[in-house]
Design a protein with these regions (language model features):
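Active-site-adjacent helical/loop segments in soluble small-molecule enzymes
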Residues: 36-93
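Glycine-rich phosphate/pyrophosphate-binding loop at beta-loop-alpha junctions
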Residues: 1-45, 88, 92-127
Length: 127
């Protein structure tokens, strides 16, 4: 999540970066103060890294819930937002696997997710 971007900052700088305080992101499953020493070397092997803002996390949580009729964990919805951004940069058709899990959303986060109606904007790969 963009507001809990310790991993992205660590990748950019080449050393583990720490957040000064816990963020209030919808994607609480990815909200760490810093990446672990065992995890960081694996992150460094990635070809890219996407930071997804809270609006996109809410957008994809709503759309996945609407389309699949299941409560999707906002952290998984964040991954969907990153995949869509990646797909927009591809010049040929790609096959992508996004693993979705669900159910772990407290009432306050659910209210925040549905505060705005994102279902009025249909998902698209158009830039």
């Amino acid at each position: 999540p963009l507001i809990a971007n310790d991993a992205a900052e660590s990748i950019r700088t080449g050393v583990i970066q720490s957040l000064s305080e816990q963020s209030n992101t919808l994607a609480d499953g990815a909200a760490t103060l810093q990446v672990g020493e065992k995890t960081f070397p694996h992150l460094q092997t990635l070809n890219g890294f996407y930071e997804v803002d809270e609006t996109k996390i809410a957008y994809w949580t709503q759309w996945l819930q609407h389309l699949l009729k299941v409560h999707v964990e906002p952290t998984c919805a964040m991954c969907m937002g990153a995949v869509v951004e990646w797909l927009k940069s591809q010049s040929s058709e790609q096959k992508v696997l996004v693993i979705l899990s669900g159910g772990n959303i407290d009432q306050q986060k659910m209210l925040k997710i549905w505060q705005d109606d994102h279902l009025q904007k249909v998902p698209s790969l158009l830039i």
